[in-house]
């Protein structure tokens, strides 16, 4: 019985990954957000926005940027990477960007 209990504890610790796995909000417009573990090696979260021809974030009726997608990346190439109409920005925190006001 003790062996079974010890085995269950070890398996639980391994499966939970002790909290070191990055979680990113995954979303393709319009909603809902789904938090998902990033694959191994992809340890940064990103958000993708629509941008106008001047490279500024395109706002919806002047209220908030239109977020197209969220996910995990291996490395960030810096703020403003992506094409002229699709801006990628990396988030500084785990599960970032769960609302239009958070980073």
From Swiss-Prot:
User: What is the protein's known function?
Assistant: Interacts with high efficiency with both neuronal alpha-7/CHRNA7 and muscle type nicotinic acetylcholine receptors (nAChRs). Tested on human alpha-7/CHRNA7 nAChR (IC(50)=42 nM), T.californica muscle receptor (IC(50)=31 nM), L.stagnalis and A.californica acetylcholine-binding proteins (IC(50)=333 nM and 3.4 uM, respectively).
Tell me which UniProt keywords the record has, alphabetically.
Answer: Acetylcholine receptor inhibiting toxin, Disulfide bond, Neurotoxin, Postsynaptic neurotoxin, Secreted, Signal, Toxin
> What more does the record tell us?
Negative results: does not bind to muscarinic acetylcholine receptors M1 and M2 (CHRM1/CHRM2). Is unable to compete with alpha-bungarotoxin for binding to nAchR at concentrations up to 100 uM. Is not toxic to mice at doses up to 3 mg/kg.
- For this UniProt entry, what is the primary localization, expressed as one broad class? secreted
| Protein name per Swiss-Prot or TrEMBL | Toxin BMLCL
Can you list the disulfide-bonded cysteine pairs? 24-45, 27-37, 38-72, 76-90, 91-96
Provide the protein's localization: Secreted
Q: What is the lineage of its organism?
A: Eukaryota, Metazoa, Chordata, Craniata, Vertebrata
Q: Which organism is it from?
A: Bungarus multicinctus (Many-banded krait)
Cellular component per GO, a single term? extracellular region
Q: Which domain of life is it from?
A: Eukaryota
